[in-house]
Structures are given as C-alpha cells and as structure tokens.
Amino acid sequence: MVQAKAQQQLYTHAAEPKAVQQRRAKYREDETTQTLPTANIMFDRRVVRGNTYAARILPADATQTQTKGPSPASTKKRTTRTLPPRTPEAVDGRRHIDIQTDVYLEELTDTVPEADTSTQTDAFLDRPPTPLFVPQKTGTDAITQIENGDLFDFDFEVEPILEVLVGKVLEQGLMEVLEEEELAAMRAHQEHFEQIRNAELVATQRMEAAERRKLEEKERRMQQERERVERERVVRQKVAASAFARGYLSGIVNTVFDRLVSSGYIYDPVMREVETAFMPWLKEQAIGYLARGVVARRVVDKLVEDAAAALAANRSTLADKAASTAATVDAWAERQAKMEAELQGKELEAVRRRPTFVLRELKPAVASADAVEAAAAELTAQAEEAANAKWEADKAEAAEKARAEAEAAAEEQKALLEELAATAAAEAEERGEEPPAEPPSLPDGVEPVDVEAEVAKAVEAVPKPPVKEVTDIDILSYMMDKGAITKDAIIQALAVHALGDKAYTNHPAFAEAEGA
C-alpha cells in the first residue's frame, strides 16, 4: 500500500499511465483465405440462388474472378473509410454468430422444364404348378338313400333339451328374484346398522363435547387459581409493607407525643371540655334515659308476651299443615316407588323373555329343540354338581371350624384338670399326705368334650344349598359360548322374523325348492 501511494504521488492524475495498445495485429492473413463464421445459408454469398436443376450463369473468367485479390487502392480506400457502428467484440471464451431474423423464407421462382418418360420391363415367367396326383379308382361305388327321420327325430330329441332349457331359465329367474329379495333384506339390515352407527356417533360427539367443556372448565379454574394466587401475593406484600411501616413508625410517634405531652406543649381540649361541660349534662341525660328505659322495658315485656302467644298458636297450625303435607308426600312417594317397581319388573320380565323368544319362539329357529334340551340338561347337571361341591365345601368348612372349637374346648378342659390336680397335690403336701392317685374329675355341669362327635354334629347341621334354576338366559349364553349359536345367526333369524312373509326363506317357491 505504501508503494501504491508513492506511485500515485508522481502523477497529477489518478489513473496510472499505460502503453498504447495496437488495435491491429502485426501480421494479418489475406481476407480471401479467412474462413467466414457459420451463418444462415439463405444469406450466404457462396450459396447459389434458384433451382438446382437450372443452368448456372457463370462469369466469363470464373477462375480469375475467384483468384483475383483486392487491389491496393481498394484496400487503402477501405481502411481510410469510416467504419460503420457494429457489435462490440466478443469476450474471451465466446464468439458472435450470424443468425436469421427474417419472418419468412425466400421463394424460389425459377421454373425447371420437366418431362415424363416411362418404360416397361417384362416380368419373369414362373414354372407352372405341378398337377395333383390322382390315383386310379379301384372298387365298386354304392349309393344309399337316407330319408328324413331315419337318423334324427327332431320332436323326440328336442323335448329333453327343451325341458332342461326351460327348467334352467325358470331356476335362474327364481334365483334372481330370491337374490333381489335378499339384497333388499341386506339393504334394510344395513340401514338399521347405519342408524345404530349414527346414534353411536351422536353419543360420541356428545361425550367429546362434554370432555371439551370439562377441559375448558379446568382451564378456567386454573386461570382463576392463578389469579387468586397472584392477588394473595400482592395482598401479602401490602400487608408486609404496612406491618413494617407501622412497626417502624409506632415507636417514633409514641415517643414524640409522650415528650410533647410531658413538656406541656400539647393538651387535649376535648378532654377539658368533657370534664367541665359534658359530664354534668351527661349525668342528667342518663338519669332521664334510665327512667324512660324502665317504662320501655315494661311495654316491651307486654308486647313479647302477646307475640309469644301468637307465635305458639301459629306454630301449632303450621305443625298440623306440615304433618298433613308430609303424609301426602309420603303417599305420593309410595305410589311412585310402587310404579317404578312395577316398571322395573316389566322391564326385567321383558329382558327375561328375550332369550325364551330367541330359543323357542323365533322363526326360523336358531337351534333345534333337542339341542336346547340337551344344553338345559347339561346346565342342570352342572348346577347340581356346583351345589353338591358347595355343600361339600360348606361341610368341610363347618367341620374344620367345629374341630378347631372342640379342640380348643378340650385343651381348656385339659388345662383345668391339670390345675385341679396341681391344687389337690399342693393341699395334700400341706397336710403331709401323698398326692391322690386318682385323677381329678371335672366340676359338676361340665361335660367332657368329644371332638369327633362335635364335628359330626356340625356337619349334619349344614343345610344343603338349593340347586340354581337354569333359565333360558343361561342356556343361550352356554350355547353361544360353545359355538352352537352365533350372533350372526341370531341377527339373520331376527331379520327374517321381522320381514315375515317378505323374507325369501318364507317364500313358497323357496320352500318347494328346498323340498325338491
């Protein structure tokens, strides 16, 4: 940078002087030998215009014209002439190319004479085809006449075919009718399930709305809680500031006022006025007020007595009305409870009737009567086995409990006997005698405990539980668990039962087809 500044200080202008550049090269090739850049051939001087079949009109001395170079005079004149403005030279790595910018092509107007000439070449002659080999006839020809009906009887042969065709057509028509009815039933069934789905969708939307309301309520409560906490924080700050201010100023104010009062600069004019003027007047007024109070108390006592009597009378009347109202309400509640019980009983009976309807009354039946009876017998046997098992378990539990109690009582009696034996031995030792050889007996009224007898008595006292009644609900659940009845079969049977005579299975044609 220092060298550049020193270089700039040598000249009065800012730009550094440079050597003059030569615009022309020191050696230039002949213009006739230079290759022209690629351009549009429609405007190239070297391309002949006109029809290519026409004769070209060349100059008298074409060779001289081609080899003739530019004269020095023309070259000098061209160099001295002012050059027209042209496109700047291309940058390094690029070049300028002439392109066509005209809208239409040039029309060729030269007409070339034309003439038609034809010639015919004879086709090659092919070898004639080889004649077919026909062997010489051997043997004797015979002729047989076949009359109509000899080989094929149309009326006899077409009858079974016609019967088959007519039967197939009728069967196909019947199948199409049954298929249409089945499609109608399936469409109705689908619409029913669509209604159920829409109802479930509405319920889902209702639950989503409830959940959304809960979330909004939760957010609102949380916002309220945050606001409450903020208000409490502000209040605590204010209370703390107020307490600090009171604690800081209380001592100062009290000290200042005590000093002023003790010095005599401050006195209470109200106190002086009260002592001199107000207290005597107050005494007189108090005496008069007390006298009026005695009279007022007497009047109030009389009014209170009258009001108490009226209140007692009103209370008795209201108590009677309340008792009658309570009786009416109790009667109404009893009627409502009775009606609700009847309604629940009807609903329970309807629920109990549904399995009976599905198993025994639904047409077509989802299961045979023998299968239902077999399932009922199996469930009854299972119920009896369960009752017996429960009875055995109850007896075992009662026996275990009775055995434990009897063994505990036996242990107590054994301990009592040991205690009596020890007491008798101690008394004999005090008397200087030997202990009695016979074991002591139980006190009067105390019977020895027999564990096995108590256990047997407890087992005999256990009642046998009743066998659970087998209902149609149990039978239906049992058969569905075993796979004897499926949900699809029940739904299809209900749909057919609901359609009645409209169902394809109840159609007489379907019944005849099944019988066939």
UniProtKB/Swiss-Prot annotation:
Gene name of the record: RSP3
Xref: Pfam families: Radial_spoke_3 (PF06098)
Function field: Protein 3 may attach the radial spoke to the outer doublet microtubule or is required to form a stable spoke structure.
PTM statement from Swiss-Prot or TrEMBL: Protein 3 is one of the 5 radial spoke proteins that are phosphorylated.
Region of interest (Disordered), ranges: 1-32, 60-90, 388-412, 424-447
Protein family according to the UniProt entry: Belongs to the flagellar radial spoke RSP3 family.
Subunit structure: Interacts with FAP91.
InterPro entries noted in UniProt: Radial_spoke_3
Keywords from the UniProt entry: Cell projection, Cilium, Cytoplasm, Cytoskeleton, Flagellum, Phosphoprotein
PANTHER family in UniProt: FLAGELLAR RADIAL SPOKE PROTEIN 3 (PTHR21648), RADIAL SPOKE HEAD PROTEIN 3 HOMOLOG (PTHR21648:SF0)
Biased composition (Basic and acidic residues): 391-412
Source organism superkingdom: Eukaryota
KW Kinase (keyword) present: no
A GO BP annotation: positive regulation of cilium-dependent cell motility
Protein's name according to its UniProt entry: Flagellar radial spoke protein 3
Sequence ranges of Polar residues compositional bias: 1-11, 62-74
One Gene Ontology term, aspect cellular component: radial spoke
Subcellular location: Cytoplasm, Cytoskeleton, Flagellum axoneme
